[in-house]
Amino acid sequence: MPRKKPFSVKQKKKQLQDKRERKRGLQDGLRSSSNSRSGSRERREEQTDTSDGESVTHHIRRLNQQPSQGLGPRGYDPNRYRLHFERDSREEVERRKRAAREQVLQPVSAEVLELDIREVYQPGSVLDFPRRPPWSYEMSKEQLMSQEERSFQEYLGKIHGAYSSEKLSYFEHNLETWRQLWRVLEMSDIVLLITDIRHPVVNFPPALYEYVTGELGLALVLVLNKVDLAPPALVVAWKHYFHQHYPQLHVVLFTSFPRDPRTPQDPSSVLKKSRRRGRGWTRALGPEQLLRACEAITVGKVDLSSWREKIARDVAGATWGNGSGEEEEEDDGPAVLVEQQTDSAMEPTGPTRERYKDGVVTIGCVGFPNVGKSSLINGLVGRKVVSVSRTPGHTRYFQTYFLTPSVKLCDCPGLIFPSLLPRQLQVLAGIYPIAQIQEPYTAVGYLASRIPVQALLHLRHPEAEDPSAEHPWCAWDICEAWAEKRGYKTAKAARNDVYRAANSLLRLAVDGRLSLCFHPPGYSEQKGTWESHPETTELVVLQGRVGPAGDEEEEEEEELSSSCEEEGEEDRDADEEGEGDEDTPTSAPGSSLAGRNPYALLGEDEC
């Protein structure tokens, strides 16, 4: 018997790599040269994410994979509704990396921040959303699902046939998630479309507006959420923009954590988070406006007096809690009934449905990921009933919540509609899970060309010997300078971890601590008019009246917006557990009418 030859761990690792590459039909050694963190993440993702029948001719990348040993006790698959996006090609990723290293960033004008919805979605084009095909009660479940799959494939084929991958944005390729939207629209009497006030055009697909108000004949309420993250003048300008272009809309301003914009704050608070205690959800700005909109829509067909009484109880409870100076327990009022919908509830209903059945109005909450749908429901209920997370795609199936005996809320998972938005903007909008981005550097460059990130964070150019000298910046330089400032180092070689730094900067932008707000067309020319508008003054007063009063604690964040400390680490955006606590980023300071200055962030010695 021949003597056994020594076989090192390095040789074994190389053997396994070659075996995997042969299985994928790739050439031996194609990826052995890439040993960076991003390269290892890409190799791992490509081993787990492959193309399947849900794509036409394009590779699909599945995000938010959950560990599962099969179906749960109720037959629920945790990966059924995960995000499905088209995968960026390796050549495209490498091209963007080179551009991030070489392209010098130039600041853009204020007019570039103005977004026109007609350029984003091109109403009337194939950039639509899939509709449920016609069906009848004579069809079996298998026939119906097969018909829906064929229709969905045709829908994807039309879009990819009309636009190249470079022009298209990320959008949902998972049919199961679109089925959730169909069911929610069929169940609803009123549809809430929740958008982020920093970029509401991104979250407002005109095709959905036409379908809901036209074909379904339902009322659509546009909720401009997170209004505490934008100047009041900009909020009012967006409100009038949507009223002008979509007259059938009911526009409501909302935020779960209102803040008085007249209150000065510490500019160094970007590195701190504000922990809200007790009755934080009961101070939401907007439930009263939403109630008035629903009363105007139902015109007395539903008794909403119980909802008005609940709002009054929440306001009184919040006021009493402020005066006591103690942390309060959860509301002892009527419990909120939560119903998780099963597969049988997902089956289509009849072509005609009784409106306001049994005196109950059903309000469907739809929108893009990470716009705050779950937080809005918590704000309406007055306490935490829905798990929330910074990770887009956190809501995996729709649930119903009885706000009062006559008001039922329906929470739908976030959906990304097809558009022509730059993918970097989608990343900054929180649509794509940051921890799973293959190439985050161009998104950082997109941000830095629109707000002065280098000056705000007091970054020193990595090649600068004289701090006072001017040096051209590229996206890679910004990431390297932030890694040096924060002490982000790779594990073995102790080099600046630019991937982690880019991840950190993107989280600052998504959280609103690096605030990038887009404007409606013509806002730059009429900015003074909007700042002196009566509704702007009214909004400032309203925010000051319902803002938090002494129930916040600030704690410094040790590891700010970091992720991927080791290979194989998954997304660490944990749910905000705890019934009465909520961690939110502390806003930056500002003026009374124009809003806080979103760019006053760090002092030189803060980190």
Curated annotation (Swiss-Prot):
In terms of PROSITE patterns, this protein maps to: G_CP (PS51721)
Return one GO MF term: GTPase activity
The CP-type G domain is annotated at 178-418
In this chain, composition skew of type Acidic residues spans 550-584
What positions does the entry give for GTP binding?
A: 225-228, 367-374, 411-415
Task: Give all Phosphoserine modified positions.
Answer: S32, S33, S34, S51, S68, S324, S561, S562, S563
Ranges of Basic and acidic residues composition bias in the record: 15-26
Phosphothreonine is found on T48, T50
* Signal peptide segment: none
Q: Is Aminoacyl-tRNA synthetase one of the keywords UniProt gives this record?
A: no
State the UniProt keywords alphabetically: GTP-binding, Nucleotide-binding, Phosphoprotein
Q: Which Pfam families match?
A: MMR_HSR1
SUPFAM superfamilies xrefs: P-loop containing nucleoside triphosphate hydrolases
Write out the GO biological process terms.
DNA damage response
Query: What residue spans carry the region label Disordered?
Result: 1-81, 547-607
Is Nucleotide-binding found in the keyword set?
yes
Basic residues bias located where?
A: 1-14
The job of this chain, per UniProt, is described as:
Possible regulatory or functional link with the histocompatibility cluster.
Q: What information about domains appears in the record's comments?
A: In contrast to other GTP-binding proteins, this family is characterized by a circular permutation of the GTPase motifs described by a G4-G1-G3 pattern.
Q: What is this protein called?
A: Guanine nucleotide-binding protein-like 1
